[in-house]
Amino acid sequence: MLNKMIGRIFAVSACISGLFLAAAPIACAHHAQDAPGMTEMPMVKPEGPVVVLKTDPENIAAGFPEAITISIRDSAGKPEQELTIMHDRILHVVIASRDFTVFSHIHPEDFGPVTPAMKEKAQFLVRYVFPKAGSYIVGIDFAAKDKAYSKYIIVNVAGDLPMGAPIKDFSRNKKFGAYDVSLKAVSEVLAAGKEMTLTYQFSKDGAPVTDLEPYLSATMHASVISADLDNFIHEHGLVPGMESMGMHGHHMHDMSVPDKFGPEIGLSVVFPSKGIYEIFGEVKHKGKIILTQFLVRVE
C-alpha cells in the first residue's frame, strides 16, 4: 500500500529534481533563479527518484510542437526499475498556464504503447503544444517502489501573445458545457494545513447526473494548483459511502469504483499554505471528459 506521507510531502513542495534540458529559461517554484541551457536544477526535495526532462526543440516557443522526454532515475542515478502503474498509466503529466486558461492531463500511453525498452530505460515521451507565451506548471505524478510521488517545475514559454492575470471568479456554482456543477465545502472558510472536504454536485437539464463513469480508475481526477504556481497537488474523488482503504483518494490505493455514480463526488484536500488555488476537476460522462474549474481562497 502506498505511503500517505510521501504523497503529501511531494504535493506540498517539490520541484522536478535533476535536469531540465531546455534553452528556454525556467524557474524552480522554490528557487526563483533562471536555469538557461543545459543547467542542472537545484534539488528541493532529495527524497525519492530524480525526474529529468528534455525538450525537443530545446527552445520552447508558443504554438510549436514540443517533444518532452521524461526520465526517472533512482537514488544511484540509474533508471528506476520499480515503477508501478498508477490509475491505469505509467505516469501522469499535468500542464497548466499561470492564468489558468490552459489545462492538459496527458500520458505517454496517449502517444503510443509503453514498450519494455522504455520501462528498462525508465524514459517516456509525451508531446505538447504550449498555446501561448508565459509561465506554465508541469506536474508529474508517478509511483515507484509502492510509493507515490508528485513533482513539478515551472517553464517559461516564449511567444508574441503573453498571458494575462487569472480571472478572480470565486463563484461556487458554474456551468461547464451542458452541465451545472456546484462546489460545496464543509466549512465556509477553507483553512491551510487541515484536511478540507469538498463536495461536487453535477446536474444536466435540471436533473441530477447519476450515471457518471470512472475515469482512469477514479471517480474524479483533481489538480489543485496555487495562483503563484508554488504548490501542485493531484487528488482523486470519492463517491459518498464508497469504502476506501487508501489515502482519501490520493494517488494509487485499494478501492472499488462503481460503474455508475453521481450526482455527488467528494474530494479531500490539504492546502499546504494560505492563498488562492485553482481546482481543475476531470470526470467522465457518456464517454466524454468534463473539465471543471473552481477558484478558492484558503486562509
Language-model features: where?
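Bacterial N-terminal signal peptides that target proteins for export
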Residues: L2-A14
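Intrinsically disordered, low-complexity terminal tails/loops enriched in metal-binding residues
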Residues: G18, P25-E299
